[in-house]
Amino acid sequence: MSEMTKTPTHYRLLSTLKAMGPYLREGQCSERFYLFDCLASCVNDKKSPEKREFWGWWMELTQNEQEMSACYHIGRYTLAGDWVAEAIPESAQAEVNHTQAEFHKKLVKTLRERFEISVTVSTESAPFA
């Protein structure tokens, strides 16, 4: 590990992941486990904002020594504030895939440069472009 790279404690990781953008669900994170999500596309934008559901993705990031495992899921974010795994309609797929792929690139780069940690995608992960 280089002199500039700090030991990846939970709080250093949390601070770094939080700085990456709005996707981290900080209140649902714990030691060695981090939850992210993205509301990429509105299910029905004709509804008033408080009644909207969204298509998107969520990801569970688990720390194992000098490696992180990312498990992505795709689906619908409900009015109740829960994710439901289901197929994304074709009209929303491009936006969901784009946000997921761009976030993953940024995650890999950030963890590699800041902590020399690699990120692997879990075999149970939903595929993305």
UniProtKB/Swiss-Prot annotation:
For the keyword Transcription regulation, the answer is: yes
Q: Which family does it belong to?
A: Belongs to the Crl family.
Broad class of the protein's primary localization? cytoplasm
Database matches in Pfam families: Crl (PF07417)
Q: What does this protein do?
A: Binds to the sigma-S subunit of RNA polymerase, activating expression of sigma-S-regulated genes. Stimulates RNA polymerase holoenzyme formation and may bind to several other sigma factors, such as sigma-70 and sigma-32.
Q: Give the InterPro entries listed for this entry.
A: Tscrpt_reg_Crl, Tscrpt_reg_Crl_sf
Ordered alphabetically, the record's keywords are: Activator, Cytoplasm, Transcription, Transcription regulation
The keyword Nucleotide-binding is annotated on this UniProt entry:
no
Compartments, as annotated in UniProt: Cytoplasm
Task: State the name under which the record lists this protein.
Answer: Sigma factor-binding protein Crl
- Which GO cellular component term is one of those annotated? cytoplasm
Q: Name one GO biological process term.
A: positive regulation of DNA-templated transcription
Q: Where is this region: Essential for activity?
A: 99-119
User: What species was this sequence derived from?
Assistant: Vibrio cholerae serotype O1 (strain ATCC 39315 / El Tor Inaba N16961)
Gene3D superfamilies listed in its UniProt record: Sigma factor-binding protein Crl monomer
